[in-house]
A protein has these predicted regions:
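Phosphate/dinucleotide-binding and metal-coordinating scaffold of catalytic cores
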Residues: 1-173
Length: 173
């Protein structure tokens, strides 16, 4: 559940207004958990246009989906809705470490939003959560440059500058 006034604020000037974290409550197995709610996808209109918007929930450390702290609920771009999900499943079966991914039915404020794709947000604990190594692995998280005006960059520039990357693990690099 999220306060309708908070949703109005997030929806007020999309995509610019959707990035603020708002307090919300996640109901899982009849237990309420405090979370932060925000929209996703400023660079991809399919995430924020229409009634079914992609969003992220940030949970406390002891949340219902631990060890995962950030969960992305994606409105899949493909019409059959399973292309990415099946790709992740196949990669996992082949031994590739993949983010946790499920197809889930979503309700927000007692309103059905249908099936969405749930992804964990990988971070510095990705390898540790999967027990892939005995030692810490250097992990960097890439973020697109901040939007400073109301213009989006013409092309995605994530790989063009080292300043777009943040060190997010405890390992020596």
């Amino acid at each position: 559940h999220i306060d309708p006034a908070c949703l109005d604020t997030l929806n007020s000037d999309l995509p610019w207004s959707g990035d603020d974290n708002m307090p919300a409550v996640l109901l899982e197995n009849n237990v309420e958990y405090p979370v932060k709610f925000r929209y996703r996808g400023i660079y991809s209109a399919s995430h924020y246009l229409g009634g079914k918007k992609s969003f992220r929930l940030s949970l406390k450390k002891e949340g219902p989906f631990k060890p995962y702290r950030k969960l992305n609920f994606i409105n899949p771009k493909s019409f059959n809705m399973v292309n990415n999900h099946m790709g992740m499943w196949i990669a996992g079966r082949m031994g590739v470490a993949t983010p946790w991914n499920e197809m889930v039915f979503v309700r927000i404020n007692d309103e059905d939003h249908g099936v969405m794709e749930l992804y964990e947000q990988p971070g510095g604990d990705f390898e540790r959560n999967r027990k892939l190594t005995k030692e810490e692995v250097p992990v960097y998280r890439g973020e697109y440059p901040p939007i400073t005006g109301r213009e989006l960059t013409e092309k995605r520039t994530l790989w063009r500058k080292a300043s777009n990357w943040e060190y997010v693990s405890d390992a020596d690099s």
